[in-house]
Amino acid sequence: MFRINKLFYSPVKSLSFSSVKKLKILNNIGIKFDRNFAFTRDLDDNKINYILNNPLERQIINFLSLKHLPELNKYNFDFENNFLKLKKNNNIILCTNINNKLEVEILCKKIQKLVPKINRVKLIQDSINPFFDTMPSKTISLINLNSIRDFEIKLSQKVEFERFRGNIYI
């Protein structure tokens, strides 16, 4: 018998995970609000529109990610009631109404200040085709902690379980 110990989802693609008590699964989409948002990485408006309209063409390099910008690991996002909250050390440093263009622009400028080597940052949203660019289909991710513990033993060092996930296709 398997037991799920913790539930996480990521409102912003490749930047953070939020712990929640329950998740809603949407048929043919995945976890509600999971990776609905992404910050683009030095893309012009034409390229942004192209990847929004062609989900299979999305690549991790087009988005801000911890893989390429580990300095963002200090930050986290929560999404609730149309507000995207940027947090550092569990403290909200900016709360953005995603329906307010001015507030979204302020958030993008804040993110750009955190990663000055990136010239242009835009927040994009797609709730029908979330930003699952690393998988060919819509997925739900699970972590088997015993597998990670075995991996730690083989490596002889601690491994952050948040970096791994198994995938279930829906």
Regions found by a protein language model. Give the residues of each.
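Electropositive, beta-rich accessory/interaction domains or terminal extensions
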Residues: M1-I170
